[in-house]
Swiss-Prot record:
Protein name as annotated: Oligo-1,6-glucosidase 1
Site residues (Transition state stabilizer), renumbered to this chain: 332
SMART domains: Aamy
Species annotation: Bacillus subtilis (strain 168)
Disulphide bridges, residue numbers: none
CDD domains named among the record's database cross-references: AmyAc_SI_OligoGlu_DGase (cd11333)
Gene3D superfamilies: Glycosidases (3.20.20.80), Golgi alpha-mannosidase II (2.60.40.1180), Oligo-1,6-glucosidase, Domain 2 (3.90.400.10)
EC number: 3.2.1.10
GO cellular component, one term: cytoplasm
Keyword Calcium assigned: yes
Superkingdom, taxonomy of origin: Bacteria
Length: 561
């Protein structure tokens, strides 16, 4: 099989917020089809489509009730088949979201499973007796807060759910479950789907003795090491590869929650025949206070040195073994320039700076819809947020446990809430940013009149065209894909600089990720190199990259000549 995914750039679509073709306020598959030429113009090769399968939408489609049919608001299977064909006509590929750690509680399998203890589908899920006092089987927590166990009156047992109680976890120990999953994968791949992004795949293998976490009793329920990397994880993925993936020329990326580099090597070492890539979370947690009862909502200031060290550890750790994904944004993360940068006066420079850091690295870049026009976090009030995670966290942290004040929580949500990524795509300065002729399912970002696709395409200096050029450079220079990576100036608190080397060529990336001026001094071994500037986000007069006085958020990429 070819390794086309190494040279690809992926564009992620969150369909409910991308483009609404029928005016019901909800993005749809025909809307995606209508905007394919826009994505092609950007230069992306692969579209990753967030879940479109039938679902009660408790967790925006990550709770699937039917893996072989579309959710009606997105369209029909015929619309999906048309989308696959239209993507392929343009020389692009399409990857779907595979959500098989859990289903919806409205899936036919679970409806059967909960009927009785001897139902043939009982072992499709994880059922346990209560403790003698009637409480949960153990102290495992749900990632969406509260217990990971919900009591079912009908059969007097608890079922396990790492996410919401409407997302019961599948029992991967049961071979019949695995066969069902492989059948779903073949169904879509036989119709042209080019691969999978595998949702929380790191959690499919459970510690089936269900041990309690040790606790200091500050928290009733705990999310920790037992929630991922279970004893049969890699056995299951190797079986999936053997049974399904190895029969197709496809791309696979696993959401590997709880993985360190050693775990990542197991997933991505080609000789092990598992997955092509994984998403790591480590660099996205640099602004989270570790071991806080408030989890991701206990935020600390952006620390560039920590970001550099973390990203470098992954760049060097997987070198010659596996392959990295490169991302700052997706449907679960806020807008990077609002989170770690400047989304006002220096918005354009800042967006281009973060893009330069990412696209100059080794790995497959993922662009999230709106990132390429510099979309920013929303300023909507707390009561207008739709996300289940936010609602549950508010109840647990503010109302019940009182570990955060409402003011502290609101401030954290304004920085890190997932809905910042989920507001509608901003197409133009017209009503609802051109997303819909109806009423949008979630409010449009108030800054859409200044930040939109139409404005971006009319401005040759826009963030869109900068991304387009970064992608073009990646196609032109193999060093951007295959070059080795070396961090420079690791303890500089303002400048992210690194060197790539490939077959005698050198690529230098220098980015000021601060609002102040900064200085880059080339290390001695680069003093005599001559450079050609490939791209920069300020007008460039210089030809010499040995010593650079950098403006706020200035980014320069040069190649040796």
């Amino acid at each position: 099989m070819s390794e086309w995914w190494k040279e690809a750039v992926v564009y992620q679509i969150y369909p409910r917020s991308f483009y609404d073709a029928n005016g019901d306020g909800f993005g749809d598959l025909q809307g995606v089809i209508q905007k394919l030429d826009y994505i092609k113009n950007l230069g992306a090769d692969v579209i990753w489509l967030s879940p479109v399968f039938d679902s009660p939408q408790d967790d925006n489609g990550y709770d699937i009730s039917d893996y072989k049919n579309m959710y009606e608001k997105f369209g029909t299977n015929e619309d999906m088949f048309q989308l696959i064909d239209e993507v392929h006509k343009r020389g692009m590929k399409i990857v779907m979201d595979l959500v098989v750690n859990h289903t919806s509680d409205e899936h036919a399998w679970f409806a059967e499973s909960r009927k009785s203890k001897d139902n043939p589908y009982r072992d499709y899920y994880l059922w346990k007796d209560p403790k003698p006092d009637g409480s949960e089987p153990n102290n495992w927590g749900s990632i969406f807060s509260g217990s990971a166990w919900t009591y079912d009156e009908g059969t007097g047992q608890y079922y396990l759910h790492y996410f919401s109680k409407k997302q019961p976890d599948l029992n991967w120990e049961n071979e019949a479950v695995r066969r069902e999953v492989y059948d779903v994968m073949r169904f879509w791949m036989d119709r042209g789907v080019d691969g999978w992004r595998m949702d929380v795949i790191g959690s499919i293998s459970k510690y089936t003795d269900f041990p309690d976490y040790e606790t200091d009793h500050s928290r009733s329920y705990i999310v920790g090491r037992y929630h991922s990397n279970g004893p049969r994880l890699h056995e299951f993925i190797q079986e999936m590869n053997r049974e399904v993936l190895s029969h197709y020329d496809c791309m696979t990326v696993g959401e590997a929650n709880g993985s360190d580099i050693e775990e990542a090597k197991k997933y991505t070492d080609a000789s092990r025949q598992e997955l092509n890539m994984i998403f790591t979370f480590e660099h996205m947690d640099i602004d989270k206070e570790q071991n806080s009862p408030n989890g991701k909502w206990q935020i600390k200031p952006f620390d560039l040195i920590a970001l550099k060290k973390t990203m470098t550890r992954w760049q060097t750790g997987l070198m010659n073994v596996g392959w990295n994904t490169l991302y700052f944004e997706n449907h679960d993360q806020p807008r990077v320039i609002s989170r770690w940068g400047n989304d006002r006066k220096l918005r354009k420079e800042c967006a281009k700076a973060f893009a330069t850091v990412l696209h100059g690295m080794k790995g497959t870049p993922f662009i999230y819809q709106g990132e390429e026009i510099g979309m920013v976090n929303s300023d909507m009030p707390l009561e207008m947020y739709d996300d289940l995670e936010i609602k549950n966290a508010y109840r647990e942290l503010v109302v019940e446990n009182k570990t955060m004040s409402e003011k502290e929580f609101v401030k954290a949500v304004m920085i890190k809430g997932r809905d910042h990524a989920r507001t509608p795509m901003q197409w133009d300065a017209g009503k609802h940013a051109g997303f819909t002729a109806g009423d949008p399912w979630i409010p449009v970002n108030s800054r859409y009149q200044d930040i939109n696709v139409k404005e971006s395409l009319e401005d040759q200096d826009s963030i869109f065209f900068y991304y387009q050029k970064l992608i073009q450079l990646r196609k032109q220079y193999k060093i951007m894909i295959y070059g080795d990576y070396q961090l420079l100036q690791e303890n500089d608190p303002q400048v992210f600089s690194y060197l790539r080397e490939y077959r005698g060529e050198k690529l230098l990336v220098v980015v000021n990720l601060s609002e102040e001026k900064a200085l880059f001094e080339a290390p001695p071994e680069l003093i005599h190199e001559r450079w050609k500037v490939l791209i920069s986000n300020y007008p460039q007069e210089r030809a010499d990259l040995k010593s650079i006085s950098l403006k706020p958020y200035e980014a320069v990429m040069g190649i040796s000549i």
